[in-house]
UniProtKB/Swiss-Prot annotation:
Involved in mRNA degradation. Catalyzes the phosphorolysis of single-stranded polyribonucleotides processively in the 3'- to 5'-direction. One of its GO terms (molecular function) is 3'-5'-RNA exonuclease activity. Its main location: cytoplasm. Residues 552-611 form the KH domain. It comes from Chlamydia felis (strain Fe/C-56). This is Polyribonucleotide nucleotidyltransferase. SMART domains: KH (SM00322), S1 (SM00316). It catalyses: RNA(n+1) + phosphate = RNA(n) + a ribonucleoside 5'-diphosphate. Keywords: Cytoplasm, Magnesium, Metal-binding, Nucleotidyltransferase, RNA-binding, Transferase. Residues 621-689 form the S1 motif domain.
Length: 694
């Protein structure tokens, strides 16, 4: 293969370049995509499946090499291994962008690998990776329905910006990553600062305009150098199988859908499927169990769609806008800082809020350096939540993605860290699942925050919207169930308060949807969100005014940066002494902000007093509660601040004459003294009798 390259300019200074033919020439497709000095290499490979499967076996792995910034990993192991959270989230973005563009019943195992080989700290790599993967897929022989591209959109200084720089994203009020084709949107993921539905659509349309430009460039490149597609890898379902299955299920789905409980419905549905497989699999070689099951799934989807289109009724009997019954139980757990049992239909979470000091913050390291997350939400999806047996271990990609979406949704409602200096951890423990568990995590997490006494700006709720798209007939569903997610065309999650949006995520199974459909879905989502918020407010209208008795107390104080070393002491000796003496936890940042946490206000005050003593400057004329450190014939030395002591002469103890200082005070006594003066040598002159008249 010869070396080939194309370029596409999005805005001035933002030119995306694709190269192929020099690297990884044995892959089905391989592209080096670059913008400025951020270079991302992507490859796609396919292998024929040994056994046909009823799903698309697509695997995506994105990795950020630390060598791309001239560094190696810290610690003993220097080789990149377990993916970071950011790498997992980007892998999901690529997967969700590419999956709708691959044909159903593609009988190939497809693997996508994407590596950041060079990162300039300016141009963010994930949209480049999406485009690079799409270009590699386009020029490969792997079948593809449509060419895809992806961009990031930011909102900086009231202006939409495509593929903003790292510095621009740090001040952007929105982060939106979207992917699509020339004609439609396939995937969106983002969060924003209470934007309206109109603003979100405006951002999507702005981003899609640039997606069209990239798609056209990749399409032209494909026509010039692309391999012939291996269409034999796509095995359509024989019409004879679908017809036979449709005949056998006729009239039976109406009885099946009378079963409202999820597990009972699934059992009955599985039994019906098995009966049909048993009846048909001996017909001839095309009636394989896989083909029959695929046809059964299609027949079930067709019936559900027909029911919605003709009667406006869903599989569980709801109308298209009806939300499942909600029940809420706050302060559900007695010893946690805040908790909520949130149930919506057959989806349920036990959400828990835990407050702590900076020591509880989540530390991370990526190409942009080390960071500290003082708010994070962790989502747990144990197998019992769907009545199954499964592994327990490190979180899967789905758990990471759902947790991050809920975290972003709630993050915009958090109080100013300067006024509420706590690290906040929310865990969402999914105990039942029948659709929309990530949005249940938003609702339950918000109520747990309020139950913990976190002064959030506004309550946040989330809802998942679905879509049934048949020819020109569009039906939008509110609060979709697991079945509607499985058989429908869209899963569009939207979170926010009553007026604005804070987070959103959309995945589709069709070839794309238009901004007009998304606009209708967002409008219906707003109505549903407001309905859920009213239910939440009926249980807990506002955050509790007091923290839990089991939550630590945290206060902050500001010291001069040049005094940080004084508080820490040689080898940390001084700060360890304060922690031990006062019974507190202390964190100090580079600006001199000191965070003190303890179980009691008294312990915090003691620590503050010690620190103030260490960093405080003595003032002439000020009275101090000093400690007698030693007694001499002519007076006593008194420590007025840690490390700062002066002489209280025998004549300064009393208005009456005294003969022996030892008769008046003992070493270790607390003695009020007034600082009279500081001589040229920096020595302090103290007086006790000067305090007697004050």
């Amino acid at each position: 293969m010869t070396f080939e390259t194309i370029s596409v300019t999005l805005e001035e200074g933002k030119t995306l370049v694709f190269e192929t033919g020099k690297i990884a020439r044995q892959a089905n497709g391989a592209v080096l995509a670059r913008m400025q000095e951020t270079w991302v290499f992507s490859s796609v490979c396919a292998a024929t499946l040994e056994e046909p499967v009823d799903f698309l076996p697509l695997r995506v792995d994105y990795q950020e090499k630390f060598s791309s910034i001239g560094k190696t990993l810290g610690g003993f192991i220097k080789r990149e291994g377990r993916p970071t959270e950011r790498e997992i989230l980007t892998s999901r973005l690529i997967d969700r962008s590419m999956r709708p563009s691959l044909p159903n019943r593609l009988m190939q195992d497809v693997q996508i690998l994407s590596y950041v080989w060079s990162y300039d700290g300016v141009t963010l790599p994930d949209p480049i990776a999406i485009c690079g993967v799409s270009a590699a897929l386009a020029i490969s022989d792997i079948p593809q329905i449509n060419i895809v591209a992806g961009v990031r959109v930011g909102f900086i200084n009231n202006t939409w910006v495509v593929n903003p720089t790292k510095a621009e994203m740090d001040v952007s009020r929105m982060e939106l990553v979207l992917a699509g084709t020339e004609k439609a949107i396939l995937m969106i993921e983002g969060h924003c600062d209470f934007f309206t539905e109109e603003q979100v659509i405006e951002a999507i349309e702005f981003g899609h305009k640039h997606i069209v430009t990239i798609c056209k460039a990749i399409e032209d490149w494909q026509k010039q150098i692309g391999k012939e597609k291996n269409t034999s890898a796509v095995v359509p379902l024989p019409e004879q199988v679908q017809t036979a299955v449709n005949t056998l299920v006729e009239g039976k789905f109406s009885d099946l859908l009378q079963i409202k409980e999820k597990k009972a419905f699934e059992a009955a549905s599985k039994q019906l499927e098995n009966d049909i497989v048993e009846k048909l699999q001996e017909e001839n070689e095309i009636f394989t169990p896989l083909n029959i099951k695929t046809a059964f799934k299609q027949a079930k989807s067709d019936y559900m769609r027909s029911l919605i289109r003709k009667q406006g009724l869903r599989s569980d009997g709801r109308s298209v806008t009806t939300i499942r019954p909600i029940s809420i139980d706050t302060s559900f757990l007695p010893r946690t800082h805040g908790s909520c049992l949130f149930t919506r239909g057959e989806t349920q979470t036990v959400a828990v809020c835990t407050l702590g000091s900076e020591a509880m913050a989540q530390r991370y390291e990526d190409l942009n350096g080390e960071g500290l997350a003082k708010f994070y939400l962790q989502y747990f999806f144990p197998p019992f939540s769907v009545g199954e047996v499964g592994r327990i271990g490190s979180p899967g990609r789905r758990e990471i993605g759902h947790g991050k979406l809920a975290e972003k949704a709630l993050s915009h409602a958090l109080p100013d860290p300067a006024k509420f200096p706590y690290t906040i951890r929310i865990e969402s423990n999914i105990t039942e699942s029948n659709g929309s568990s990530s949005m249940a995590s938003v609702c339950g997490g918000c109520l747990a925050l309020m139950d913990a006494g976190v002064p959030i700006k506004t309550p946040i709720a989330g809802i998942a919207m679905g879509l049934i798209l048949d020819d020109d007939h569009v039906t939008i569903l509110s609060d979709i169930s697991g079945l509607e997610d499985h058989l429908g065309d869209m899963d569009f999650k939207v979170a926010g308060n009553a007026e604005g949006i804070t987070a959103f995520q959309m995945d589709i199974k069709v070839e794309g949807i238009t901004p007009e459909i998304m606009q209708a879905a967002l409008a219906q989502a707003k109505s549903g969100r407001q309905n859920i918020l009213e239910t939440m407010k009926a249980t807990l209208a506002s955050p509790k005014t007091d923290l839990s008795q089991y939550a630590p107390r945290i206060e902050t104080m500001q010291i001069k940066p040049n005094k940080i070393a004084t508080v820490i002491g040689p080898g940390g000796k001084q700060i360890r002494q304060i922690i031990e003496e006062a019974g507190v936890q202390i964190d100090i940042n580079d600006s001199g902000l000191v965070s003190i946490s303890a179980s009691s206000p008294q312990a915090i005050e003691k620590a503050k007093s010690i620190i103030e003593g260490l960093v405080g400057e003595v003032e002439v004329g000020k009275i101090y509660e000093g400690r007698v450190t030693s007694i001499v014939p002519f007076g006593a030395f008194v420590e007025i601040l840690p490390g700062k002591e002066g002489l209280c002469h025998i004549s300064e103890f009393s208005k009456q004459r005294i003969e022996n200082v030892g008769d008046f005070v003992k070493q270790g006594d607390i003695l009020p003294v007034k600082l009279l003066s500081i001589n040229e040598k920096g020595q302090y002159k103290l007086s006790h009798k000067a305090t007697l008249s004050e």
